[in-house]
Amino acid sequence: MTGRQFGSARAAVVLAFGLMLALSACDRPMESRTPWVPHLERMDEALARNDLPTAQRAAHDAFVATLITATWEGKIAVGQAYQRLAQHPEWRAEALKTARREYLDAFFLARQQGSLDGLLASAAGFASLGDRAVVDQCLFFARIMAVRVGGDAPQRVAAWTERLAGTGASARMTESF
């Protein structure tokens, strides 16, 4: 086998392996597609027992799980979890900082994945933090995506804009970041 043939064979094997991984993801049970969920359940159970160190460890484990899956859904879920941790004064500042970072990651993943739902969920996350400027930016990009998607997407964005304006988040969307 020549070097060129070997290179072609190796490329074919790599391509086949990649295709196999992609197809197997569709057949995986929901738990393996949402590996952060058990950690968040453990966090909530620990919070209910007022076991703050275990809750923090579980939240961190969920955070790590979202690094592996790289989905906006996981980032939103972990951001919300860190907001629950922020209800405890000793972790408030760090937890809110982490929640904000998770919502920002969710925003960029949603844009990359072409997910209008992800952009809207990111906007809601920032609204819950009171970050009006970033809510505006999320909704700005949601409007752009809604025009591309068509259908009822523009109406959905308008409804979210109105809903988030009711939370104190601004609805001005004139410039991007």
What are these regions (language model features)?
Residues 44-54, 85-97, 128-136, 172-173:
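Short coil/turn connectors between adjacent alpha-helices in alpha-solenoid helical repeat scaffolds
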Residues 59-61, 93-106, 135-144:
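Alpha-helical repeat scaffolds
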Residues 2-13:
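Bacterial N-terminal signal peptides that target proteins for export
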Residues 26-58:
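N-terminal leader/linker segments that initiate helical-solenoid repeat arrays
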Residues 148-177:
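Terminal, low-structured helical/coil segments at or just beyond the last alpha-helical repeat
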Residues 46, 59-66, 106, 110, ...:
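Eukaryotic all-alpha helical interaction scaffolds
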Residues 33-44, 71-88, 116-128, 159-163:
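Amphipathic alpha-helical repeat scaffolds of TPR domains
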Residues 12-22:
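Bacterial N-terminal signal peptides
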